[in-house]
Amino acid sequence: MKHLNSISEIYLKRDQEILLLFRKAKRMVEYPTTMAKLCDYIAKMPASCYYLADSTAYRYVCKRIKGEKPKFGKYQAMKEKLFEAFYQDFLRLRQMEQYKEYKTKHLVYVCLDLPAPNIGMAPRYIQMKINNYFRNKKTSFITR
């Protein structure tokens, strides 16, 4: 559990994955391209796991089980799709025989380790993360 105003460990791992996806995307896109197009491509690439805080994922699943559909802001479409994909994976695992005895909390932890359809961030926020990384790294930014 994270403390007030602290940075969650999962978000640090997510930022590392964004940089890995950035390097992968640079090799895959056709040049000439722009940073915005690269970030749009990264936003659609699959991630190695769900980069959601465990408590947030658990609360979302509990609300969905009760029949409520949590509201997201109008600018959080990517996050809403990610949570919905997470919930569908949760339901799929719940039906499997080997997970029948798992409690909801433990099944959420298992689901968080599954591959995610995307990183769950809008391209502009991905671009901000990448720009901040290279600004703080104090090296030249080469896009090729």
Where are these predicted regions, by residue range?
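Short, solvent-exposed linear patches
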Residues: 34-37, 103
